[in-house]
Regions:
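Acidic/polar loop patches that form or flank catalytic/metal-binding clefts of enzymes
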Residues: 157-165
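Conserved polymerase palm-domain catalytic core
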Residues: 34-127, 131-146, 150-152, 164-170
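A generic secondary-structure signal for well-formed alpha-helical elements
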Residues: 10-18, 69, 73, 154-158
């Protein structure tokens, strides 16, 4: 447990992760929703990841993100040993939130870019749940297809060689 706390704090400092605040997100969403009645058309889509923590490969996150930041040799060795032994960001580990937030932050950036020209006016993700609001009618099938593209790009990068791949997908 002490090792997990140390690793989490190290990653918190290096990645400057801002953990989602559910209350803040809800207030922002309600502000947007209250303005929707003035719009001619809009769409709202909610999505969630299936069994999120248990599908994010800790080895993948290490190889794709953590190994690229400046860490001391002993820290790299600790992380390598940890991700080899844990395989996934299992719910309950102190490191699970940070590992998932590192990759999910990248997912958020990719998703926002993919929806940039589709009238996206609001997007927030709280851990494994996301909500998108558009200023025009957007079909659910198109939205889900674009979300799946972002998932493939972020969680299934073929250039990252790992023993345990991410299994992340929509519910």
């Amino acid at each position: 447990e002490t090792l997990c706390i140390y690793l989490k704090r190290t990653l918190d400092r290096k990645f400057h992760i801002r953990y989602p605040n559910r209350n803040e997100y809800m207030h922002s969403l309600f502000d947007v929703i209250s303005a929707l009645h003035n719009m001619n058309d809009f769409s709202i889509l909610r999505f969630d990841f299936e069994d999120f923590f248990n599908t994010v490969s800790s080895e993948y996150v290490f190889n794709k993100y953590i190994s690229k930041i400046s860490l001391e040799r002993f820290q790299i060795a600790l992380f390598e040993n940890f991700v080899t032994n844990t395989k996934y960001a299992y719910a309950g580990f102190n490191t699970s939130n940070i590992l998932c937030e590192i990759i999910a932050k990248h997912f958020d950036e990719v998703l926002a870019l993919k929806f940039k020209n589709h009238g996206l006016i609001f997007y927030r993700r709280y851990i494994d749940d996301g909500i998108l609001v558009f200023n025009k009618r957007m079909g659910a099938d198109l939205c889900i297809s674009i979300i799946n593209e972002a998932i493939q790009e972020v969680f299934f990068d073929k250039s990252i060689a790992v023993k345990y791949n991410c299994k992340t997908r929509l519910n």
